[in-house]
Amino acid sequence: MTLVFQLAVFALIATSSILLISVPVVFASPDGWSSNKNVVFSGTSLWIGLVFLVGILNSLIS
């Protein structure tokens, strides 16, 4: 169970880092938002899901 928690935390950190870099790049590009809107929303949904998953796993481990 601890390994699953560690992998979930790693995935959350990796997704946060990717979104931290990619979202400003999408907003700065001329047609970036209209062409990459679905990718940004998918990444944000993944991030929110990982936050809840890490919270649930943390309550099970502690």
UniProtKB/Swiss-Prot annotation:
It is found in: Plastid, Chloroplast thylakoid membrane. Belongs to the PsbZ family. This is Photosystem II reaction center protein Z. GO terms for cellular component: chloroplast thylakoid membrane; photosystem II reaction center. The chain crosses the membrane at residues 8-28, 41-61. InterPro entries: PSII_PsbZ, PSII_PsbZ_sf. PANTHER family: PHOTOSYSTEM II REACTION CENTER PROTEIN Z. Its main location: plastid. One of its GO terms (biological process) is photosynthesis. SUPFAM superfamilies: PsbZ-like (SSF161055). HAMAP family: PSII_PsbZ. May control the interaction of photosystem II (PSII) cores with the light-harvesting antenna, regulates electron flow through the 2 photosystem reaction centers. PSII is a light-driven water plastoquinone oxidoreductase, using light energy to abstract electrons from H(2)O, generating a proton gradient subsequently used for ATP formation. The gene is psbZ. It comes from the Eukaryota. It is a multi-pass membrane protein. It holds the Pfam family Ycf9. Keywords: Chloroplast, Membrane, Photosynthesis, Photosystem II, Plastid, Reaction center, Thylakoid, Transmembrane, Transmembrane helix. PSII is composed of 1 copy each of membrane proteins PsbA, PsbB, PsbC, PsbD, PsbE, PsbF, PsbH, PsbI, PsbJ, PsbK, PsbL, PsbM, PsbT, PsbY, PsbZ, Psb30/Ycf12, at least 3 peripheral proteins of the oxygen-evolving complex and a large number of cofactors. It forms dimeric complexes.
